[in-house]
Amino acid sequence: MKHEEANKEIGGRGAEGQRSKRVGGNSKIQNIQSPAPNPQPIVPNTQSPVPNLDNWLEIGKIVSPQGLSGELKVYPVSDFPERFEVPGKRWLLHLDGTEPQPIQLLTGRYISNKNLYVIKLAGVENCDQAEALRGCKLMVPASDRPQLAEDEYHVLDLIGLEVFMQASGELVGTVVDIIPAGNDLLEVKLHPSFTTDKKQKTVLIPFVEAIAPVVDLKSNRIEITPPPGLLEINN
């Protein structure tokens, strides 16, 4: 399951969200743009109004400098690698900023054992300039959602779907979150009619085709065929 964009691509306003896929696979969009000429050093905005991010998606957060040449470590909230590896225009939201500011992504690479990207932005040439961007968010316009492959879904589209037992039609509950894993998991808040155990509020359901064979966004429903005991044992 790949995640992408919901003002964050997973759960929450302002982050790119993520795409979710019931079986493995990757969809890459090559949208390469040339670096801007004569890049200028970036100076954080010193104002502090609340930003309006309705039209923006967060794809990552700058966590620290990397080395002495201005590279930056970014924690991704999107699992589209092209967001961090394909050169082109991105936007920076400074800690006290009201509007994301355009910036050119020059290079990027993934550090798999840390789940971080190391990127180079135009105009960030040394450690001090990189340090000034700690905590800033990388953004893209909300209209810039990558196309999804078959059996991939935007996380925002899955949140709120009702989950039903396919065989009986019984309402199980509502999807409240997506848990990234080897096979992503649907976190489902149980409907009161489905369980007599008041302590059990949610269950985790593997988002694989064998268990969730029907995803009907138009009808706002997912149909599941869980193996015996799954809905009880994973709580």
From Swiss-Prot:
Residues 150-230 form the PRC barrel domain. Residues 1-19 have a biased composition (Basic and acidic residues). It comes from the Bacteria. InterPro entries: PRC_barrel-like_sf, PRC_RimM, RimM, RimM_N, RimM_N_sf, Transl_B-barrel_sf. GO terms for cellular component: cytoplasm; ribosome. One of its GO terms (biological process) is ribosomal small subunit biogenesis. The keyword Phosphoprotein does not apply. It is found in: Cytoplasm. Residues 1-49 are annotated as: Disordered. Binds ribosomal protein uS19. Its main location: cytoplasm. Gene3D superfamilies: PRC-barrel domain, RimM. This is Ribosome maturation factor RimM. The lineage of its organism: Bacteria, Bacillati, Cyanobacteriota, Cyanophyceae, Nostocales. Belongs to the RimM family. GO terms for molecular function: ribosome binding. Pfam families: PRC_RimM (PF24986), RimM (PF01782). It comes from Nostoc punctiforme (strain ATCC 29133 / PCC 73102).
